[in-house]
């Protein structure tokens, strides 16, 4: 992979990003490396000065072999280097990274998901189906991990829901070189806020739902900005699939129609849903049977274009909850648009078990434990309301924490949902970052009505889990929320190893047996 200085200049001009160029040598200079982290610079590297940039980073990059830097203003430490001064370094990084890695998106059929809840689950379902349809040639970029190929060494833990653009195009190119033909990925609102997917057009873009989340000093200033960023996925997709039951449906559908013809927009909803405005629902789904281990549901194509996809039928799901049937229906539609047939869809849905999603453990002499990634008001409400209904109003004990440095609005959301459904809550640690976990817990606690919800704080997460399980009685439900299968706690910039909630729950169960 390589990129000349002339090519960089032309690309930046084409995207109206270039302010000025300062050359220090041959404009045909061939750059064989690309980086935004000075620790990853090698000889003849193109270096981006982005984010929380400090001039010493450019000094380090220059010493390591960087020959050109991209920034929004000239930097003294870059004297002696070529300088590309741009209006927006994040956008510049996206378009130059795509070119450096030779536009790998052109070699992939890309299905992308956005939504406040369900992105990860729907993405896993879609990849599972497409793995059958493509003979295991479907990559996955999710909140949990990145799957770039068929081998174990092609699987990596994710740091961000949507990677930085340079990493995104690198991983796409690696996936293509590993023989992948399809890619399923999550696209966060921050990906558009920070231009991580700038210039990308998706083959299929999904809008699952929207509710207030990710609003805070380090994320979105308000809900309107959050919604606007979410909508950009539809504006940049060739086919759009929308959950017709989403909040702000009118705004969502209008965004899709700005760049996509109606015949390439698909709507889905459960059979009981009657839209407030006259729209044609293309797919309906309906629960047929549910146990505490699985659910069976039916997907029916209603419109002519939906029938042509050929995926109407009965499905079996190893995840319970009507919200998971909705996610699975989305995946069936997305995979069908990517070439999957009914058999691949049924097999892919039936076999999948997603780590950290509705994992359950029965503890002898105590309650039933559920581990789930539900990490905001909307997903917690869906989870707790479902468990309350299925178990006929059990006592609900919830262990939960909220992350530091982001998603400040989640804290009030957790308090609200605990007030609505929980009998007992233990507030604990979940990726505190640079904040004090006790302060985060106190913010959640401030919104809880303790006359309704017996609430305590136990900062050590393992101890909190042990306490909740020990307290529980047969017939109770213990929910270990928001962390899923995450094997780390993010503390002051360091990923600190953590056994996972389920591992700790199993250890406690063994001690109690």
Swiss-Prot record:
Keywords: ATP-binding, Cell cycle, Cell division, Cell shape, Cell wall biogenesis/degradation, Cytoplasm, Ligase, Nucleotide-binding, Peptidoglycan synthesis
Gene Ontology cellular component list: cytoplasm
Keyword Cell cycle part of the UniProt annotation: yes
Binding site for ATP: 115-121
Modified residues (N6-carboxylysine): 230
Gene Ontology process terms (BP): cell division; cell wall organization; peptidoglycan biosynthetic process; regulation of cell shape
InterPro entries in the cross-refs: Mur-like_cat_sf (IPR036565), Mur_ligase_C (IPR004101), Mur_ligase_C_dom_sf (IPR036615), Mur_ligase_cen (IPR013221), MurE/MurF_N (IPR035911), UDP-N-AcMur-Glu-dNH2Pim_ligase (IPR005761)
Main subcellular localisation: cytoplasm
UniProt: UDP-N-acetyl-alpha-D-muramoyl-L-alanyl-D-glutamate binding residues: 38, 161-162, 188, 196
Posttranslational mods: Carboxylation is probably crucial for Mg(2+) binding and, consequently, for the gamma-phosphate positioning of ATP.
SUPFAM superfamilies recorded: MurD-like peptide ligases, catalytic domain (SSF53623), MurD-like peptide ligases, peptide-binding domain (SSF53244), MurE/MurF N-terminal domain (SSF63418)
Keyword Cell cycle tagged: yes
Domain of life: Bacteria
Subcellular location: Cytoplasm
Pfam families assigned to the protein according to its UniProt record, in alphabetical order: Mur_ligase_C, Mur_ligase_M
Pathway: Cell wall biogenesis; peptidoglycan biosynthesis
EC number: 6.3.2.-
Molecular-function GO terms, alphabetical: acid-amino acid ligase activity; ATP binding; magnesium ion binding
Family affiliation: Belongs to the MurCDEF family. MurE subfamily.
Purpose: Catalyzes the addition of an amino acid to the nucleotide precursor UDP-N-acetylmuramoyl-L-alanyl-D-glutamate (UMAG) in the biosynthesis of bacterial cell-wall peptidoglycan.
Record's protein name: UDP-N-acetylmuramyl-tripeptide synthetase
Organism field: Latilactobacillus sakei subsp. sakei (strain 23K)
Gene designation per UniProt: murE
């Amino acid at each position: 992979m390589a990129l000349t200085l002339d090519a960089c200049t032309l690309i930046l001009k084409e995207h109206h990003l270039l302010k000025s160029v300062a050359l220090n040598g041959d404009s045909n200079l061939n750059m064989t490396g690309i980086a935004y982290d000075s620790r990853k610079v090698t000889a003849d590297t193109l270096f981006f000065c982005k984010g929380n940039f400090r001039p010493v980073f450019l000094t380090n990059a220059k010493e390591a072999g960087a020959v050109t830097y991209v920034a929004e203003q000239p930097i003294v430490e870059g004297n002696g280097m070529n300088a590309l001064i741009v209006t927006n370094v994040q956008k510049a990084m996206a378009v130059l990274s795509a070119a450096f890695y030779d536009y790998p998106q052109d070699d992939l059929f890309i299905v992308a998901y956005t939504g406040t809840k369900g992105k990860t689950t729907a993405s896993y379902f879609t990849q599972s189906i497409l793995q059958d349809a493509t003979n295991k040639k479907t990559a996955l970029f999710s909140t949990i991990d990145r799957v770039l190929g068929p081998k174990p060494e092609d699987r990596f833990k994710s740091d961000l829901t949507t990677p930085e653009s340079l990493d995104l195009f690198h991983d796409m190119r690696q996936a293509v070189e590993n023989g992948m033909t399809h890619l399923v990925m999550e696209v966060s609102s921050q990906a558009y806020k920070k231009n991580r997917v700038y210039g990308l057009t998706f083959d299929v873009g999904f809008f699952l739902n929207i509710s207030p989340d990710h609003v805070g000093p380090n994320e979105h200033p308000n809900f309107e900005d959050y919604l606007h960023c979410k909508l950009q996925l539809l504006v940049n997709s060739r086919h759009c699939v929308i959950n017709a039951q989403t909040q702000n449906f009118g705004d969502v559908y209008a965004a899709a129609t700005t760049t996509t013809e109606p015949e390439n927009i698909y709507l889905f909803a459960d059979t009981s849903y009657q839209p407030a405005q006259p729209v044609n629902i293309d797919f309906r789904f309906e629960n047929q049977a549910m146990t505490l281990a699985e659910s069976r549901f039916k997907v029916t194509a209603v419109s002519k274009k939906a029938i042509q996809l050929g995926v109407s039928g009965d499905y079996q799901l190893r995840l319970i909850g009507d919200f998971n049937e909705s996610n699975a229906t989305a995946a069936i539609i997305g995979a069908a648009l990517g070439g999957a047939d009914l058999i691949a869809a049924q097999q892919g849905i039936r076999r999948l078990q997603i780590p950290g999603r509705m994992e359950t453990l029965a503890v002898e002499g105590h309650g039933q434990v559920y581990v789930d990634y539900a990490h905001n008001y909307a997903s917690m409400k869906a989870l707790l309301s479902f468990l309350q209904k299925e178990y006929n109003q059990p006592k609900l004990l919830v262990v939960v924490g909220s992350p530091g440095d982001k998603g400040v609005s989640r804290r009030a959301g957790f308090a609200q949902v605990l007030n609505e459904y929980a009998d007992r809550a233990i507030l604990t640690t979940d990726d505190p970052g640079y904040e004090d976990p006790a302060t985060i817990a106190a913010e959640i606690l401030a919104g809880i009505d303790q006359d309704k919800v017996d609430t305590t704080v136990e900062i050590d997460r393992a101890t909190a889990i042990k306490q909740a399980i020990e307290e529980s009685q047969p017939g109770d439900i213990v929910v270990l929320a928001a962390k899923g299968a995450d094997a780390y706690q993010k503390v002051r910039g360091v990923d600190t190893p953590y056994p996972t909630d389920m591992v700790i729950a199993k250890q406690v169960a063994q001690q109690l047996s």
